[in-house]
């Protein structure tokens, strides 16, 4: 993510800022990718702290307009959790906008979000036909850690959930193209394999032996749909980590040039090589403070080829249907 210029003075603005350091209200314009010191502000600004501009005063911004169902406010912590969930959604949508997904120039369908709070029964997250269902309860760090440990996952965050579920929607968009499915099946396998049976087998038997040689996560080994979603989410992780590193003014010997833009990079292998070197370095720094790795995953040769495949399609796919 970029670091933005203060529109009314010196200093920087961060992506989630509602105001400058001196208290001037600001809002983010996702089309121009800049902050403005004036309305119209999103109608959700006072409700969930949305800091995007709206087409007119009293209207929802581009991101909030995609939320069709909001959580039941009578459920404890629903609104604070929704606030964090929508912030993660805005972050991921802006990342994807760098490749023109879901912007006005994108002729295809937008995701529709169902943001649901949890009562006694957990809410299953997923995607069906352009509708992305998200459990806002996962924004609660205690619940997220509890579930991460129960599922033996090395990483579980709301941004991760957003990237994964939106990746399913991106696959659905790309599958409408005549040239996608054959190439996808050659790389990931046939997605027509029975999905419920595959997940049941995964949760009963676990991943196949040696899965790390072919998959980024054990869950990716369950079914081609999940392999795509995990791989696409990881491409977004790695690209945004690299972009944030550059935006922070840091540099690396692997970085092609000063001011290099990972989202403009056409050579996916170079992007992945740079990202891999950065996460290895940051993982090492985190360990110096006894912290968990920023990116606790291994990039096998086959996983890198899948990342290259996803990069190629996500960079050019938004101009299709």
Residue spans for each PLM region:
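Post-HExxH zinc-binding segment in Zn-dependent metallohydrolases
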Residues: 172-242
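Pan-zinc metallopeptidase signature
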Residues: 4, 11, 220-321
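Fold-level signature of zinc-dependent metallopeptidase catalytic domains
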Residues: 56-85
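Short pre-active-site segment immediately N-terminal to the catalytic Zn-binding motif
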Residues: 142-162
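N-terminal cysteine/histidine-rich coordination modules
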Residues: 1-64
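Auxiliary, metal-adjacent structural segments of Zn-dependent hydrolase domains
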Residues: 80-141
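Active-site recognition of the HExxH zinc-binding catalytic motif
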Residues: 156-177, 229
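A short mid-domain helix/strand-loop element embedded in enzyme catalytic domains
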Residues: 110, 123-149, 177, 198-211
């Amino acid at each position: 993510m970029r670091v933005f210029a203060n529109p009314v003075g010196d200093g920087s603005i961060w992506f989630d800022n509602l105001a400058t350091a001196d208290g001037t209200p600001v809002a983010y314009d996702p089309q121009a990718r800049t902050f403005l010191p004036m309305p119209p502000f999103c109608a959700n600004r006072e409700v969930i702290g949305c800091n995007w501009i709206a087409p007119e005063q009293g209207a929802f911004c581009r991101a909030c307009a995609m939320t069709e169902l909001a959580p039941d406010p009578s459920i404890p912590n629903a609104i604070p959790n929704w606030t964090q969930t929508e912030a993660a959604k805005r972050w991921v949508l802006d990342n994807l906008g760098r490749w023109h997904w879901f912007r006005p120039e994108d002729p295809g369908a937008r995701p529709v979000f169902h943001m649901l709070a949890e009562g006694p029964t957990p809410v299953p997250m997923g995607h069906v036909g352009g509708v992305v269902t998200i459990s806002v309860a996962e924004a609660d760090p205690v619940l997220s850690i509890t579930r991460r440990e129960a599922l033996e996952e090395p990483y579980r965050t709301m941004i991760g959930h957003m990237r994964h579920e939106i990746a399913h929607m991106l696959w659905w968009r790309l599958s409408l193209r005549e040239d996608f499915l054959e190439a996808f099946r050659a790389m990931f396998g046939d997605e027509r394999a029975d999905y419920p049976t595959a997940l049941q087998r995964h949760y009963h038997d676990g991943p196949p032996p040696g899965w790390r040689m072919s998959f980024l996560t054990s869950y990716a080994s369950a079914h081609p749909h999940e392999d795509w979603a995990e791989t696409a989410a990881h491409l977004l992780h790695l690209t945004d980590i690299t972009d944030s590193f550059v935006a922070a003014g840091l540099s690396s010997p692997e970085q092609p040039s000063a001011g290099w833009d990972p989202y403009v990079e056409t050579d996916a292998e170079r992007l992945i090589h740079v990202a891999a070197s950065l996460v290895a370095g940051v993982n090492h720094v985190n360990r110096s403070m006894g912290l968990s790795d920023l990116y606790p995953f291994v990039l096998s040769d086959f996983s890198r080829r899948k990342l290259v495949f996803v990069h190629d399609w996500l960079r050019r796919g938004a101009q299709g249907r």
